[in-house]
From Swiss-Prot:
Gene Ontology molecular function terms on file: PDZ domain binding; urate transmembrane transporter activity
Protein name: Solute carrier family 22 member 12
Native organism: Rattus norvegicus (Rat)
Subunit note: Interacts with PDZK1.
SUPFAM superfamilies documented for this protein: MFS general substrate transporter (SSF103473)
Amino acid sequence: MAFPELLDRVGGRGRFQLLQAVALVTPILWVTTQNMLENFSAAVPHHRCWVPLLDNSTSQASIPGDFGRDVLLAVSIPPGPDQRPHQCLRFRQPQWQLIESNTTATNWSDADTEPCEDGWVYDHSTFRSTIVTTWDLVCDSQALRPMAQSIFLAGILVGAAVCGHASDRFGRRRVLTWSYLLVSVSGTIAALMPTFPLYCLFRFLVASAVAGVMMNTASLLMEWTSAQAGPLMMTLNALGFSFGQVLTGSVAYGVRSWRMLQLAVSAPFFLFFVYSWWLPESARWLITVGRLDQSLRELQRVAAVNRRKAEADTLTVEVLRSAMQEEPNGNQAGARLGTLLHTPGLRLRTFISMLCWFAFGFTFYGLALDLQALGSNIFLLQALIGIVDLPVKMGSLLLLSRLGRRLCQASSLVLPGLCILANILVPREMGILRSSLAVLGLGSLGAAFTCVTIFSSELFPTVIRMTAVGLGQVAARGGAMLGPLVRLLGVYGSWLPLLVYGVVPVLSGLAALLLPETKNLPLPDTIQDIQKQSVKKVTHDIAGGSVLKSARL
């Protein structure tokens, strides 16, 4: 008796699975708030140099005459590229000649300026404080802001490697429980840190634990659910991220101080840590590591919740031992990473699949973590992205079955790329249009994630499928780390980051057209199955009078 049959006995889609889904998907909403947090905690408010005439009461008292604030600002700070007060320069001495009505640009362009030696004055009308205002991450230090975001995303990459190994060794539920605790503790400490490096360190720890939460949530949902209900559970898990974006915008709207916001999104994980001790360990994992007595107890617990106690009474350690013998060995074919890179039928599939994964992570996190560049009301924009993501994820499943994998993958990358490129041409004054294009683009990237997850699983044989998918996820996280850093190109032109964010998904989407279609094809189990599919494709195309170059891919 294999494990799926054991699960059917105790109930693979019953009351327990419903309760487990609620318990596991609820933290996913708050995981999303951690991922998107720095849209708000690292927001850059309007700012200018501190100047004595405006910000020092003694200097103000010595001003001859009665001048308004705008006049004092004009004689203290030169205009910036957008004709607003310059954010990083001030006049060394007040330029009183600028008050004259016949003043031209020459009157101030030759005046001596200097950096903001005495600090900055920030606009607190939207945020009481952010990490930018706390540690002055502007002007010469502006690169530190996207660096903090990249450090967080690097933590997810490291955490995925560490937690993946730990969950295979120590169990899914145990690693999940301690991941909840690490998020809550590290997130709370990050909110109290007095220096920027320490803040980044604890945000890195939060991210590594976030990876553990995401990975082990998916594992427990799948390993305690029947094959028929598995896609539903994965859909609920994906929708948790969508609702989480709405939650992020709502919480940030109500909490405008970055320290309090960091605390607000970290505190719920203490509750998740407490109730996670109730969750059962994966019986499938317990069987594979030979812990049959504990596996039997967990199966009986699930059966009791699903009201199948009579069926559970028929389970014994001997039955579980036979199930352990029937579990497939993941190393049966000796397939390795080199197989993906050196096998002609798999090499190009691997590279293009990784390119699609990279394009998603690079573009999504590059844009989703800088909503200020896409619209004026970032609270509403964050919520709208989550709302649009809901039907997009559901609709992408329908389109995959109708249009096929290859076309859906290509269009779900090309469309957001075109939306991003179009935003270059839209003036900042047209905020509604810019926000609409941004929401459409980021929503389409949600479809791209759904497509690449399914498509990459079908492109590779069973013996090396998880290696290929894991390689793709590494590419996505690598892209996510690089994405925020592209914003540093903005010093050479505000349009340049958007150009890069737009070109990468367009080129990746076009490359996806070189992949073979996998719609309605049986999943390949061996490398020989891939080669047979290629031969059939070539034969079919020759019979039809055309030979596609992608047939060997």
